[in-house]
Amino acid sequence: MSEPPFDDDQHRISRRMVIAAAAALAVPIAGYGDAVSQDATKVARMPDTKSTWPHGARLAVSFSLMFEAGGQPISGAGGVIPDPIQQGLPDLPTNAFFEYGVYEGIPRILDLFDKHKIKMSSFMIGHAVDKAPDLAREIVKRGHEAAAHGRTWENSYALDPEAERRFIADGMASIEKVTGQKPVGWNAYWMRNSPRTLDILQSLGFLYHIDEPSRDEPFIVPLKGGEFVTIPYTFHLNDIVSFPFVGWDAAAYEQALRDEFDQLYEEGSHRRRMMVVSLHDRISGHANRVRSLDRFLTYARSKPDVWFARKDEIARWALSTRSATPIINRGPPTVTGLPGSAA
């Protein structure tokens, strides 16, 4: 997808960068016995110019739609029932809960975002795409990004290097075969990657990942193969955390979205700010939650200078505005405990 048109002279607005080089970190990393040194994580180049989002926007808002139904294990996936089923037995109601995402949730969410003319990034599990190819194609047909979420809905961080690469590449191949779009974005199961994942992703052609909740703006991490973008995640705006575990109702979630938006929008007058929200097919696709999202989107769209963007657009924008994008040099994840290059 092409980058949004912009004219630096016409659309650049004032901003004050507040990212400062971190003080020395001397926190022991559990399991390694080493301290994070002053040089383990640092800002490689401080932005020295004013910057904006496209067209002078003061806030970028990006939604993720998690397409997971059919990619979960038949037993032990977890859901709304607090008592886990006996190991090895099919969890019938939980699997039916996942099916809701295909038959009701995603179609309802797609219609809502069509109404508001907003495009999302859909993180798709390979097996989910294989089982519901028409739905995957429909997501892309409506202008949303097809991003990768693994071959199945399970951890991959403990796999050996070749197995991890296959796990990522297999899911990627399913998405490209069905939708015609090669994924450039990655989200791991519960954000847990191995120390080498980012290097693997880059070698496969990915531009960005979202598996780090450390900032409210995108940044670049240099890897051995070049620059790689991080588009930070937000746990507290993830519906899978808010609804089943915290026990929020739709009204409380809507208020949290508004509060997050208002604070970041205010900060956006002098800092580049970004708000990201993750929606799951089987959770936010329920009728009352879509109604709540509808009200929030109406509110957010009423504000001027807001850029609603897919995450691939944000990643490309970050790479095209290097003078204004933090570049974070990190040591190996086994030393820093943070995502980076294993080399």
Where do the PLM segments sit?
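Metal-dependent polysaccharide deacetylase catalytic core of the NodB/CE4 family, i.e.
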Residues: 86-90, 107-110, 114-195, 218, ...
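N-terminal secretory signal peptides
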Residues: 1-13, 21-27
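C-terminal domain-boundary segment and adjacent tail
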Residues: 44-46, 208, 220, 258-343
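Residue-level marker for buried hydrophobic side chains located in beta-strands
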Residues: 61-63, 146, 307
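N-terminal regions that are enriched for targeting/export leaders
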Residues: 42-97
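Active-site-adjacent pocket scaffolds in enzyme catalytic domains
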Residues: 40-55, 173-271, 322-327, 342
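Conserved, mostly hydrophobic/aromatic
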Residues: 66, 113, 201, 231, ...
